[in-house]
Amino acid sequence: MSLSPEKANELKQIIHDHLIKMDIHGKIRDVLTETVQGDGHHKQCLLSEEDFMHALQRRGIVNDVMKDLHFTNMYNSHTEADSVNKSATHFMDQNITQLKTANIGQLKRQLYLQVVGGKAFLEQLQEPEPLPGQVCSTFTLHVHFRNQRFRSKPIPCACEPDIQEGFLLEIHRDGPGDASKMADATTMLSICDPVHMVLIKTDTSGDTTLVSSYFLDWRTVLSAPNGKISVSAELLGVGAEAKVPAGVLNLKLELYPPLTETLSPDVVTMQKSLERQKTAEKERLFLVYAKQWWQEFLDIRPSNKSKLVKIFAQDENGVNRPVCSYVRVLRAGRLLESPRQAARFVSLLAQERAPVVGGGVRQEQWASMMVFLCRNKGDCEDHATLLCSLLLGFGLDAYVCVGTKVKNIPHTWVMTCGTDGSITFWESFTAHRYLHRPIDPDAPSMILQPKPVHPYQTLGCVFNHKIFLANCQVSDAVERCVFDFTDGSRWKAMSEEAVRSVCDPGFNTSLPPTPPLCSSSLVPNEASNQLELEMRYLLSEHRKDLGLATVWDDHLSYLLSAALSAYELERCAGVSYGNEEFQDAVRRAVPDGHTFKAFPINFLHCNARRAFATCLRSPFCEEIVCCRGDHVRLAVRVRVFGYPESACAVWIMFACKYRSVL
């Protein structure tokens, strides 16, 4: 039986609620404990997944689940008109899938992280109570641990949110050939990777807000007598509210299979203390070096003090970190096929400056990569560091540039150096690429100098995950810069060893772990069809309010697909194709004496009402939507292109053909 995504998600939700209600986690835990303890030869023979499933069946757990699970006739309760009237935000809130699943392997140690509710989210007291049936704001918890990512289902925002989720995290070894071996207590104690928990709030319009970014040190469970421990994680706010409590999550940690010998609490505490001391000493030494390096940079030329040389930046938790630590070599696997497609993906993540209370200068906040991906929006620094990380993953010599753009506005972008000496600038907000052509200040005045086509004015420094270089040329104007990084008279470099000591995860255990990219949860064809139905409904209702009838031309709508596909390919690859075929097809579809008009527009979201309201602000689109004349035929086509991390490029084209009435 094939179900639509909405019905499938509704079915999953019913099953999930039923399992929570009957405390399936507790029953499975009891059966596992009884099976392990009751097996007389468990020390010589490890419990397999098949044995455990047989144990569940023998104790009737599976039968109990199926016996108490009842389904009502939910499939006939929604009509097509109802689905058209729903907002796109409502559909997106339901379209939640677990990003990564794991099975209990007989040779792998697992950490079961269970969230059993929250409390003291006092800011939610200011939120009005939603009306029955009204879409409300939701919390979503994202979890990252050692290259594994999960997210919870959306939970209605409340002072005491009912977050009931379990995440099975695999504790694997790093060494080659060791991944299949069971990690013992000593090995796990040396694994200092925290569990990164990011709490996101999504409002009724689909806008996301970062509530908290929390790093959980899970190793306290290694000293628990029975391999179980309950903890309360106090979440703090972000940015200016980094020291203000945002709420508390109640957590349960449990190891599978349990340890035969637990560690002493003093041993775990001592290990954490030694790691903190080691990290603090490295950071102190780097700070001393950075101060000395900065003074040497100022001694070269007093005017260097005014250049934008960014050595440290604050993250969402108010922690000062070297800027090089925000860049990683990030490989996207099969999710992105080329550097230009990576640039397109980054440009689809929305722009948003860090929120600030009150007026004044711009609040600068560099988000860790996990936070940026979960929130799906950020400032120029977040976009630039992510794009640089992806370009490094594709094997390019990429750097983040810190400087200014037009009107002397501070800005961050990306630069790549070709093997032939060419320099290319990448604008992470738009995915535009600019070839750098420097101006020769010593050239005779009669020689025509190249005019810059990029929007960048000055450049203070460049960096990636290994290298930090400050611009010590006489002028920091971008068009005059010579990018010969081996020339010490033009670029002052930091010691690569010093940078590595605080920016390499292998040397500094306090750095946030680098998350993998996750595939899109969107089904492009279904999302396109749904959004197109909603746009047709909104356009028809708008014309009805104006006293105009609406007659659709389905063939003309279909022809618009070719243009939308070409637009997205041009954004990705920088080349256009198929325009001649599209124009020829339109000419054949429009009779003599008729006029054809079309209006394409690009969005980063699937909210039909927001998109339609934006389109009506354009006089060209309004002219098409409100078209009057003889034999008026309307067409609308929607194409949704899915990208990693739920990013999407939504292309909408409105068109009409009519015979003018003079």
Curated annotation (Swiss-Prot):
Assigned GO CC terms: centriole; centrosome; cytoplasm
Annotated TM spans: none
Major site of localization recorded for this protein: cytoplasm
Gene3D superfamilies named in the record: 3.10.620.30
Keywords annotated in UniProt: Cytoplasm, Cytoskeleton
Subcellular location as annotated: Cytoplasm, Cytoskeleton, Microtubule organizing center, Centrosome; Cytoplasm, Cytoskeleton, Microtubule organizing center, Centrosome, Centriole
Similarity-based family: Belongs to the CEP76 family.
Function: Centrosomal protein involved in regulation of centriole duplication. Required to limit centriole duplication to once per cell cycle by preventing centriole reduplication.
Protein name (record): Centrosomal protein of 76 kDa
The species this protein was found in: Danio rerio (Zebrafish)
